């Protein structure tokens, strides 16, 4: 086991009845790293978080946090980690300040002792310190939950979908806060269904139905996308999607924002040029007069789609 890694997982399996929640998960997360688990609902992200925070036992495999076994050393792990679950779980009938004081007391510390760690976050919620947590906005609840998870200065911070249901401005602010926390040496493991947030991580694991599809830096994952990616647009987008999928040269095609993202079976440069020309002719024959076809760079979401069995 590599001691430079704060989190180690080897062959982790977890089933809920007939549902395979986690299937042979092996990961190493380095000390001081901001690592992202990226995937849709049902990918296994929350189950993995619960195992690492000692709230759930794996069916098989081994996992350690800070060199401590998640089964044998669960008490010590709980003292060393901070956990912000996906659902707001603070005491809604306590005020902001009362929640912070309560969690500080649980860990035998005070707000003042670790104020330097939460200062940037606390100054944003301090004007509401007498307001009950249940009356806060989504963004303020998020900041309060993060402050409570940090109040004892954990070595590792687990954040389970912290930006779900939060407005875009608060999402950006939250990731900026994570960058500042990383600079203080805290190892951060964050999960999110938002593929666009992957670029804020040092490394990411793309997850689907309990499996890790790929683990690398965001740039590394994008570099594995080997096919030409085309963005195709028209006024008749619904009909266009069906026709693009029926085109003989199509490898994959899916709706993506205001365009359809298309990859081709042909991969050689000369062959692609010929197929694109054939695609234009094909669409003209289908009656399209306003189609635009643009070559684009793949996003993390495109890479995720390319890893799907049905893609």
Identify the residue ranges that each predicted region occupies:
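Conserved protein kinase catalytic domain
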Residues: 78, 119, 222, 304-305
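Short, charged/small-residue-rich alpha-helical element at the C-terminal edge
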Residues: 226-311
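ABC transporter nucleotide-binding domain
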Residues: 176-265
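ABC transporter nucleotide-binding domains
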Residues: 7, 14-207, 214
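ABC-family P-loop ATPase nucleotide-binding domain
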Residues: 1-13, 310-311
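Residues that form or flank phosphate/diphosphate-binding pockets in enzymes
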Residues: 72, 113, 216, 239, ...
């Amino acid at each position: 086991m590599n001691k430079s890694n704060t989190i180690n997982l080897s062959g982790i399996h977890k089933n809920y009845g007939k549902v395979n929640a986690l299937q042979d998960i092996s990961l190493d997360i380095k000390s001081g790293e901001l690592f992202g688990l990226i995937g849709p609902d049902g990918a296994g992200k929350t189950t993995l978080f619960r195992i690492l925070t000692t709230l759930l036992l794996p069916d098989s495999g081994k996992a350690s946090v800070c060199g401590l076994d998640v089964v044998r050393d669960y008490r010590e792990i709980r003292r060393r980690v901070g956990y912000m679950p996906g659902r707001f779980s603070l005491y809604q009938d306590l005020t902001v300040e009362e929640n912070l004081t309560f969690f500080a007391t649980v860990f035998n510390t005070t707000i003042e002792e670790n104020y330097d760690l939460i200062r940037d976050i606390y100054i944003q919620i301090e004007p509401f310190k007498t307001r009950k947590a249940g009356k806060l906005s989504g963004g303020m609840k998020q900041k309060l939950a993060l402050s409570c998870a940090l109040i004892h200065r954990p070595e590792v911070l687990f954040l389970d979908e912290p930006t779900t249901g939060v407005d875009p401005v608060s999402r950006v602010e939250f990731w900026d806060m994570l960058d500042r926390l990383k600079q203080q040496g805290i190892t951060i493991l964050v999960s999110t269904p938002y593929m666009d947030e992957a670029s804020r991580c040092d490394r990411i694991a793309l997850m689907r139905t309990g499996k890790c599809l790929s683990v690398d830096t965001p740039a590394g994952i994008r570099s594995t996308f080997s096919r030409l990616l085309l963005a195709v647009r028209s006024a008749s987008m619904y009909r266009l999607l069906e026709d693009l999928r029926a085109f003989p040269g199509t490898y994959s095609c899916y709706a993506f924002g205001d365009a359809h993202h298309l990859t081709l079976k042909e991969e050689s440069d000369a062959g692609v040029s010929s197929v694109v020309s054939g695609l234009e002719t094909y669409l003209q024959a289908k009656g399209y007069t306003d189609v635009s076809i643009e070559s684009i760079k793949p996003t993390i979401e495109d890479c995720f789609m390319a890893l799907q069995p049905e893609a």
